[in-house]
Regions:
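Terminal, low-structured helical/coil segments at or just beyond the last alpha-helical repeat
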Residues: 3, 28, 34, 126-175
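Canonical tetratricopeptide repeat
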Residues: 73, 107, 141-145
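Position-specific recognition of the canonical hydrophobic site in helix A of tetratricopeptide repeat
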Residues: 38, 45-46, 75, 79, ...
């Protein structure tokens, strides 16, 4: 009984201190070296040197793991290599830092479309619709990409159904 007030005060102090460290930093507090490394990675990506760009983005993340732009850049680079699943993971990391990042939401949805995961792409599009308030040009492109992929999936399903109903061709018999 005597130690209850002291224990409560100590636990409250620890809870406040731990929540302060979890809250992280704002984008403006990202290490300047990490920002410079991301810019170099972006330049390498634009020049078509994707492997080199990935190295720069990894360095940026080593300097400051809260650099959302580094995760987005890394996602773009691995997606350029055709690794859509891996890019989705990097977009997830960016969205963990800022769940309302419109660029990460839109580009992750495009990666979902490329992977054939249209339901997840639609979920991202719904989130993007609620987040986007002004310039939402990416929504039109995303909607068109989802519709096109959906039509392709339906056409492929129809072709499979048609093939199944036709069955095997009859064997020719000698007269």
């Amino acid at each position: 009984m005597r130690f209850s007030p002291a224990a409560i005060a100590l636990s409250l102090t620890l809870a406040i201190m731990s929540s302060a460290s979890i809250s992280g930093r704002a984008d403006k507090d990202i290490d300047a070296r990490s920002i410079a490394l991301v810019k170099t990675g972006d330049e390498e990506t634009k020049a078509g040197r994707v492997d080199s760009a990935i190295g720069w983005y990894e360095s940026a993340l080593a300097v400051d793991p809260r650099n959302r732009a580094a995760y987005v850049g890394m996602a773009r680079a691995v997606q350029a290599q055709g690794l859509n699943g891996k890019s989705i993971g990097f977009y997830n990391k960016a969205l963990e830092i800022d769940p309302n990042d419109q660029i990460a939401l839109a580009e992750q949805a495009h990666a979902f479309v490329a992977k054939g995961a249209l339901e997840q792409a639609r979920r991202n599009m719904a989130r993007l619709t609620t987040v986007c308030r002004t310039d939402c040009a990416s929504l039109g492109k995303l909607s068109a990409a989802i519709n096109l992929a959906s039509k392709k999936q339906q056409a492929q399903a129809s072709a499979v159904d048609l093939k199944a109903t036709l069955g095997a061709a009859p064997e020719p018999k000698a007269n």
